[in-house]
Amino acid sequence: MKKLLLFFVVIFSTSCFAEWKMFVNRDGAVKLYYNAENIEEKDDIYLVYVRSYFAFEVPLNQEQKYRVTEAFIELDCIESTYSTLKTDFYSGYNLTGLFEKKVFENPEKKYLSRRNAYWRLAEIIC
């Protein structure tokens, strides 16, 4: 029994066991979740993992299409801004087919607006 438990711990990463909470559902076409267990906070600035699931393939370039992204974002509750620090692109819904990782050295700060999906996340976290 211990070997079986160890097998599952090794096979599945800790992110699989994290508490992912939905904060956007656009008629099933796009669903966004945030990792509620691993939020880091310092002086009203939050670091959060966000997963986006698309019901359709989204073109990244002419050759590659993705269905899931996992982004690590910085959410500033004082300035009402967010920055994407890194993004991983997957072709499969169960986070398989990782084909590109983007890490942003100097991430651009973008202001939150009601039209932006992260506005809802800011309402929850801030």
Annotate each PLM feature.
Residues 4-13:
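Sec-dependent N-terminal signal peptides
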Residues 16-126:
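N-terminal secretory-pathway/extracellular module detecting exported/lumenal segments
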